[in-house]
C-alpha cells in the first residue's frame, strides 16, 4: 500500500509502502497485536498487482489523538505482560526509532516529509515508553502506600495490645 499523510506521499521511512494481507478465509486466520493488529495466516500468499492508496492522517491533531489512544493500549498491554522500562530506555528506544526511520529506512530521501514522519515516530515511541514508565511508577507508589498503611496499622494495633 502507498501511504499518504499530512499532504505527503511517502516512499521511504516509517511510512514506506508496505504489504498488507487483505483477502483471507476468516476461519484460517488469527490476529496479532492490539495496536496495529494484523491477520496471520499460514496459507500460501499471492501478491496482487498495484497498490492500495492509504490516506491515513490529514492533520497533526488527528495523528495526536490516534497516537494517544494507541500508545495507551500498547503501554497497558505491555505492562500486563510484565514489561518494564526506565527513563533512559524511553529515550534510547525513541532515538533508535528515529534513526531507524530516518537513516536505515531512508526517510531522509523523502526530504521534509521524511524528517517530519521520523520525528513523529520519535514522539510516538517516547509516548509509549513514558506511559509504560508511568504505569509502573503508579503501581510502585500504590505498593508503597499499602506497605506504609500496613506498617501504620501494625503500630496502632500493637499499641492497643
Where are these regions (language model features)?
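Catalytic-site signature of metal-activated, phosphate-bearing donor transferases
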Residues: 1-139, 146-148, 156-158
Amino acid at each position: 500500500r502507498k501511504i499518504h499523510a499530512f499532504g505527503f506521499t511517502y516512499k521511504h521511512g516509517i511510512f514506506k509502502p508496505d504489504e498488507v494481507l487483505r483477502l483471507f478465509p476468516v476461519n484460517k486466520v488469527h490476529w496479532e497485536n492490539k495496536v496495529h493488529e494484523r491477520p496471520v495466516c499460514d496459507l500460501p500468499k499471492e501478491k496482487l498487482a498495484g497498490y492500495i492508496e492509504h490516506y491515513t492522517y490529514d492533520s497533526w491533531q488527528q495523528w495526536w489523538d490516534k497516537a494517544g489512544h494507541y500508545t495507551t493500549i500498547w503501554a497497558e498491554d505491555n505492562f500486563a505482560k510484565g514489561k518494564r522500562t526506565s527513563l533512559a530506555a524511553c529515550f534510547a528506544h525513541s532515538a533508535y526509532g528515529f534513526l531507524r526511520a530516518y537513516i536505515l529506512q531512508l526517510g531522509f530521501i523523502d526530504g521534509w516529509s521524511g524528517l517530519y514522519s521520523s520525528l513523529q515516530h520519535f514522539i510516538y515511541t517516547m509516548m509509549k515508553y513514558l506511559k509504560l514508565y508511568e504505569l509502573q511508577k503508579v503501581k510502585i507508589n500504590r505498593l508503597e502506600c499499602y506497605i506504609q498503611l500496613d506498617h501504620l496499622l501494625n503500630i496502632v494495633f500493637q499499641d492497643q495490645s
